[in-house]
Amino acid sequence: MEQVNVTLTETIKVLLDDKKFSTLRDILITMKPFDIAAVFENLQDEKMPILFRILPKELAAETFVEMDDETQEFLIHGFSDSELKEVVDELFVDDAVDLIEEMPANVVKRILRQADKDMRKQINELLKYPEDSAGSIMTTEFIVLRPDMTAEMAIKRIRRTGVDKETIYTCYVTDANNKLIGITTVKDLLLAEDDELVKSIMEENVISVTTLADQEQVAQMFSNYNFLALPVVDNENRLVGIVTIDDAIDVIQEEATEDIEKMAAVLPSDKPYMKTSVFGLYKKRAPWLLILMLSATFTSAIISSFEAVLANV
């Protein structure tokens, strides 16, 4: 992760040591989750749970998602069941799936025990899709509208259900069989007359992908069309999820990391290249360097044994 302001990080450490938790909380709520997660990377292990418990519930979950796998696992081991449930309850389903895929079996069991029945069902559905497919990175938390709704009815539905959705700007219109027939935006709905029907507002020429589409292809579509979200459908064009821009960016980072590691002869890493420590890169590259060294030594020995012959040529 990028380093946050060093002075701010040191200030947070001092406030932790001095147990000035109220002041610390006031500072943390002004920071972005990504930057707070970066602070955790510079903390001693015993300080991490203390800082995490100071965070407001929603901010704590958002920060948790931005942490690296090792920090997440360390914190989970220190959580009580009720603390873990608070975090899990605040996670979007796709983030919960990402977390589960990176954790050991004993941690996964704890996470699933604390998830409610509906979330467990959604997690299990997403885990069925092949790795690196659109289905594996999509979320099932989005706004669905019906074509015969008025703009006023649609806005009311968004207000009523939007709080638990990963994105509400783009809304998806489906028929009675859940087949995707159009999309619209909150902006379009707000600018329409109250009694105007969704079917007269929506865009019918919808670009979508199937659940088995390669995630790299999906990420490329975000780049090509400047999407904020992309609908995912099954083989019968039924809407099953959406991929959001933040997940597409994660895919792009993963692919870039793989390309860099291949060029640098480095073993694959779970972390993006720019977030991996120098020691981590050394451990990944060392086996290849050892092989090259042995190969060079072997080649040199062969050449040396033929020096006399070569000298007479």
Tell me what each language-model feature is.
Residues 1-267:
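Hydrophobic packing positions in regular secondary-structure scaffolds
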Residues 148, 258-313:
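Alpha-helical transmembrane segments and their membrane-interface boundaries
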